Amino acid sequence: MTSAVGTSGTAITSRVHSLNRPNMVSVGTIVWLSSELMFFAGLFAMYFTARAQSGGKWPPPPTELNLYQAVPVTLVLIASSFTCQMGVFAAERGDVFGLRRWYVITFLMGLFFVLGQGYEYYHLMGHGTTIPGSAYGSVFYLATGFHDLHVTGGLVAFIFLLARTAMSKFTPAQATASIVVSYYWHFVDIVWIALFTVIYFIR
């Protein structure tokens, strides 16, 4: 009996430790995120090109960016990286309840960000900043819009992951999936920090 318990404990420990080893899913995700980084680099290049060719005030009237609204939304998204990582730590310990708790919090923070961005779009469009209205409108909505789509994709990933952990026994494969989702979430957070800095502070 003691031998059986010892064998079981060794197997669980081995599976947990295996999460720290590189695997094809994690490596593939990193390679894919590298290609996504190049995509966003193209959007940054487009933004700076439009800015260089504007020859006037940037952003041009009637655009009025609301920094006081953007800062709290940004801080919430940054904080969501920490809650996401806490979920990863829970997954590595085999703590499915901790994983769910932290990932639900992360999901809600990401949703808050998306809704905040939607409100900013509503405000800007109401003041005449549109895609066909100016070069600034085009590059602003393209850059931030594609980022919002990526954040939304992350929210969908959280939903699927949480559903999987609720419908079946927690497995090392699910723990690996949670780690992969965290890679993606950290990526969209880092991209937003760069976008936020460029759009709101580099005039």
Swiss-Prot record:
InterPro entries: Cyt_c/ubiquinol_Oxase_su3 (IPR024791), Cyt_c_oxidase-like_su3 (IPR000298), Cyt_c_oxidase_su3-like_sf (IPR035973), Cyt_c_oxidase_su3_a-hlx (IPR013833)
Catalyses which reaction(s): 4 Fe(II)-[cytochrome c] + O2 + 8 H(+)(in) = 4 Fe(III)-[cytochrome c] + 2 H2O + 4 H(+)(out)
Annotated GO CC locations: plasma membrane
EC class (word): translocase
Transmembrane segments: 30-50, 70-90, 102-122, 142-162, 179-199
Compartments where found: Cell membrane
Keywords annotated in UniProt: Cell membrane, Membrane, Translocase, Transmembrane, Transmembrane helix
EC number in record: 7.1.1.9
GO biological process: aerobic electron transport chain
Keyword presence, Transcription regulation: no
Example of a GO MF term: cytochrome-c oxidase activity
Pfam families xref list: COX3 (PF00510)
Membrane topology: Multi-pass membrane protein
Recorded family membership: Belongs to the cytochrome c oxidase subunit 3 family.
Protein name: Probable cytochrome c oxidase subunit 3
Taxonomic lineage of the native organism: Bacteria, Bacillati, Actinomycetota, Actinomycetes, Mycobacteriales
